[in-house]
Structure formats: structure tokens, C-alpha cells
Amino acid sequence: MEFPEHSRHLLQCLSEQRHQGFLCDCTVLVGDAHFRAHRAVLASCSMYFHLFYKDQLDKRDIVHLNSDIVTAPAFALLLEFMYEGILQFKGLPIEDVLAAASYLHMYDIVKVCKKKLKEKATTDSTKKEEDTSSFSDKVECLSDGSSHMAGDLPSDEDDVEDEKINILPGKTDLATESRNMWIRLPTESASIPRTVGEAETHTTAAGKTAVSPCSSTGSLSHRSAISMGDSADVDCVLDLSVKSSLSGTETMNNSYLSSQEILRNSLVQVKVEKEATCDKNDIDTTEYDIERNTVKESVSSNIRASYEPVHLAPIREDSVLRELDHDDKASDDDMITLENERVQMEANTDNSLLPYVPNIISPTGQIFMCPLCNKVFPSPHILQIHLSTHFREQEGIRSKPANDVHVPTCSLCGKTFSCMYTLKRHERTHSGEKPYTCTQCGKSFQYSHNLSRHAVVHTREKPHACKWCERRFTQSGDLYRHIRKFHCELVNSLSVKSETLGLPAVRDWTLEDSSQELWK
């Protein structure tokens, strides 16, 4: 007579005994963490423990695991799986579980983790494509509306009437794109008299979304009567060729320039210079122009005015795809000036950071704005250093546990960890602390597993034996490499035989998956 629930009842009893410490005959050390368990269960679920306990069983009360590969939370999760048959990640990074399972040769768990990582990567790529496509549709819709808005604005009397700027979408070569974008905010500029037409335009735009002063669809301005020094143009040039221009609304909201009092006597002008071959003597310092082949600023102004959070990568990609065709035959005379528009801000704009603005503006009245986070800096050199932090943050960020507000973070390098134990172990790399000392020779080590590995030098012990040829090794890694090199075909034949006999999958000790994970 068969009892279907017998195996489940047996696992439940073993799990209760482990929690009570009853009949536990071994201790697994992962760094400073101790785990009591039963040898039979460990050897049945892990090829690593099976080889460890096969020889000299009575001398294997304590097992040291490599804490650089196996973390304490990951081993606790795998230990629960051994006793309960249920795998629950509990917010732990899948990469940590995968590394621990590969180290312990638990290949069923390795396959599950690889599958989850593959599904996660597929989901992220699909979501990114959907976001990009929806963003492109939104940009096309807003660009049509912005082109009509630009037609209603008055044009400058000195420029040609009814002049149109054709915006052609398409990919352009990044090497020929506009370079040296800079932003200037003079704090002491004479107020320019407003004409009747400008006053009407200002009144009409008060109830609508503010049009960006750096938008290519904005109306043309009068020539500025204020002259700037020639040296100022050289100092404020910064290479930001890949970044898209910022809208006026986004600039004012996110860089602490949200007060109408400051904007009343401020002139926001953006200049996108052409190729580096332009003669500096031909640049008129009394005029701050913008070239006709600039990007669609009206699109970015409409999108950012709606305060919708948009990921940086789609904005960059869309701005590059929608830049105008570069006209190599265009001369410097084709440049047009911007209008000195008064930007209307929302009544609920946050003014808490406003007092910091005068302190960061240089004595010459220039500030330099980051196109990624809209922070302002007094010099282009400081801005360049700040920009490098954005690109460092995009690489090497370890995934954080889900629903974990207090993530252990290193105060020196900012690296995050899954638990406080791994953080403390990481801090030794900065302090150089070596708390583990050999009693035989007095040599110190940073990690306990290094001390255990060193102890074999004095004992000349070779605890790891090959079950096929009885050859012995000092380290488990040497044994593993030996099995791969000399007995790989034998292991594969045994795994095929196990499948034919219908043996439990947990004892199927193939080396295909773990060999790629640990020993590349």
C-alpha cells in the first residue's frame, strides 16, 4: 500500500528537527553565519556536500563555504528548499541565488534561476521597446501642435517674413551634429521694451503651457543691445553633442530658477555652434543666435511641461532620430535670434531652493546647466566632472532587494548589498582589516575561508577525494576540475542512466550548467 503524503510528512519532520536543533550532526559556516543541518539531507540535495562527506565522514562536523560566492541569505534560502521542497526568493537578487546554487552543484535551482533571468531580460527589452514606440507617437502628435503654435507668434521686423523651418525626421551622423551647446543667464540685463504685439502674445500664453525660450519654433526676437566680452564665449563652451536641448519650463522648474522676480530681468539664450572650423572672429558677441539645424525644442517643451516622467534613454534616442538634416552649405548668415520671452511659471512652483541661486552664479553672470538632471554649476569644468558621475552610475549597479527601504550601503564607495553581513565584509576592503589569524604561523587574513584554505598548508591534508579514481586534492576546486577533465564522459553516462531508471532528478549530477558558471 502506497502513502502519497509520506514524503511530504518526512520533509516536514526533518524541517522541524532542523529548527529545533534535534539530531543535527553538522554545522555550515558562511562567513559569520552558522547553519545547523543534517548531513544526509545536505548530501542528498547537493553534489558538493555529497563529495565532501563521502570520505572521512566522522571528521566533517563543520563545513566552511566560500563567502565571496555564497552569501548567508542565499544559503538560507537553499537550505529551506532542501527541507521543504519550495523555492521562495523572498526579494533576494536572483544572481546571488544562482551563484550559490552553482557553487553547491544544485543544478535544478541553477536552471530555474537562469530561466528567471532570461524572462526578466526579455520583459525589460519588450517594455523598453513599447515605451520607445509610445513615446515616438506622442512626440509626433505634439510636434504637429507645436508647429501650429509657432505660426501664431509674431516675427522680428529685421528678419524675412513668413520664414519657415522644416523639420525632417531621420537618423543623422552623430559626428556632424551640432556641438558646444552652452547656456547663459546674465543676471543684470537691461529690460527690453515690449511692443503691443508682444504684450498680446504674453497675455494669451499666460493660461497655456509656457513656450520654451530655447525652442526653434518660438518667435524671433529683437537684436540685443547688451554686449558681452569675447572671452566669455570661449569659457562657456562645453561639448554636449549627444544631449538633447532642454525646454524652458524644465530648465526653470528643476534648476531652482522658478521665481518670476529673477526671470524678469534675465535673458535665457542658447547657442548651438556649428563645426569647429567656424572662424571665431566672425561670431558677433552682441547677438546670441541659434542655428536653424537645431533639434525640435518645441517637442521637448510640450512633453516636459506636462510633468510626465520620461526615461533618459528614449529621450536621447528620439532627439537623435528627429534632428534636422544638416545643411553643409549653410552660412553663418542663416542664423536667427531668439525672442526675449517672459516665461510664466505655475503658482504652485517650489521656491524653497531659490536662495541658493545667487551663490552659484559666477561674478560674470554665467551658469552652466546639466542637461540630464538640470543642476547648475558656476564653471564648465565643474559641470564636466558632474556629467561623468551620470555615466558611472549607469554601469555596475547591483540589483537591490524588492520592498527593502533600508538597503545596506557602503559609506565610502556607495555600493549596495543584500544584508549587513556582506556590507561588513566589504568594508574590510577599504580598511584593510584582517581579523582571522593563523595559530600556526601568525599570518592574518581578511576572510575566514582564506584562513581555512591556508590551514591545509600546515596539516598537508587532502580532504577532497575523487570517487572514481580515489585521487585526493587539497581544494574542492581542484577536485572539480579533475572530474571535468578526466571523468566528464563517465558522469554524463551516469546521468543518462539515471534518467533511464527514473531516479530522482536531484541526484542527477551533470556538470553542464555549473561548469559554465564557476570555472570559465
UniProtKB/Swiss-Prot annotation:
BTB domain: residues covered: 24-91
Pfam families named among the record's database cross-references: BTB, zf-C2H2, zf-C2H2_4
Keywords: DNA-binding, Metal-binding, Nucleus, Repeat, Repressor, Transcription, Transcription regulation, Zinc, Zinc-finger
GO CC annotation terms, alphabetical: nucleus
Gene Ontology biological process terms in this record: regulation of transcription by RNA polymerase II
Family: Belongs to the krueppel C2H2-type zinc-finger protein family. ZBTB18 subfamily.
UniProt feature coiled coil, ranges: none
Protein's name in the database: Zinc finger and BTB domain-containing protein 18
Role description: Transcriptional repressor that plays a role in various developmental processes. Specifically binds the consensus DNA sequence 5'-[AC]ACATCTG[GT][AC]-3' which contains the E box core, and acts by recruiting chromatin remodeling multiprotein complexes.
A single MF term (Gene Ontology): DNA binding
Superkingdom of the organism of origin: Eukaryota
C2H2-type zinc finger segments: 368-390, 408-430, 436-458, 464-487
SUPFAM superfamilies linked: beta-beta-alpha zinc fingers, POZ domain
Subcellular compartments: Nucleus
Region named Disordered: 121-140
InterPro entries according to UniProt: BTB/POZ_dom, SKP1/BTB/POZ_sf, Znf_C2H2_sf, Znf_C2H2_type
